[in-house]
Amino acid sequence: MKISFAQKIKNLFGFHKAIDSAFFDELTDALIEGDVGAKTAFELVEKAEAICKERKISEEKEVLLVLKELITPYVNFISLQPEKDKTSVYLVLGVNGVGKTTTVAKMALHYKKSGTQNSIMAAADTFRAAAIEQLQIHGERTGVRVVAHQSGADPASVVFDAAESVKSHGGGLVLADTAGRLHNKENLVRELQKIDRIAKQKADEGCYKKILVIDGTTGQNALRQAEVFHEAVGVDAIVLTKYDSTAKGGVAIAIGKELGIPVAFICTGEGYKDIGVFNPDTYINEFLGL
């Protein structure tokens, strides 16, 4: 069973009689193991130690509140809400295996239930026939229309057709699934940049967003993935999948600190309903055990 960061902190307080340098060394290790990342962990602990000395802090909760104070600026929320009577395009990015296609379906159902008119899922991962089929199955189950071409087709043309369809119906939302073969990085980047140009042209002003899906259990790999996609096309928002507050989960802090990308949604399970609007305060409190 994985021990949460919050439990590790409680164990630290049980083991150490004083809030001293040895305590802060172990706090650094716990943050790194919690996927906050070494650089961010060292910076946070250095600042926390100085504040605790200055304020003469000796209680567990006070130390955690200092950490919360320091972490809060790095963890931000972005509201992704399509505008009525406008064409919105949300390009959903991520490596294979993070739950990207399922996340597209979860988001589509979320928007359908919240009253977004004319939502469409675009099967723009044309590299994998299985991805197209998977999205079509999700479409049948959620009642959300899917625009798809044959396997091997130009992904940008799929997004173009989906956006044209939405536009012809007076506006709505295109959620575009995309390829994630990071092992073939150069080809993938070129493909995404082409889709990016088309999506930007077809969406109404201010209605185009690039959303990166990351697996909350993959730690610093997720940060490296975010760096690649952010450099390629720019990322506006994160969806954190496979999130389990009892395990690691600190990667949103690392991405926020290093890249400044906010989080829109958090997914806690496989079901279509297992998606929620991200709440930074709840996330930080769960991470720290407050």
Residue positions per predicted region:
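Short glycine-rich anion-binding loops that position phosphate/pyrophosphate groups of nucleotides
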Residues: A179-R181
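Generic structural signal for short, flexible, solvent-exposed coil/loop and linker residues
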Residues: K2, S21, D25, C52, ...
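Short hydrophobic/aromatic residue motifs in ordered secondary structure
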Residues: A38-T40, R128, D244, Y272
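Short glycine/serine/threonine-rich phosphate/pyrophosphate-binding segments
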Residues: K100-A105, A129-A131, N221-L223, A247-G250
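Primarily NTPase-proximal linker/entry elements flanking Walker-type ATP/GTP-binding cores
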Residues: I3-A124, A131-K167, G171-A176
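Conserved catalytic-core segment of NTP-binding enzymes
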Residues: P155-S168, N184-G289
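Acidic active-site catalytic centers that drive phospho-/nucleotidyl reactions
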Residues: D35, D125, D177, D215, ...
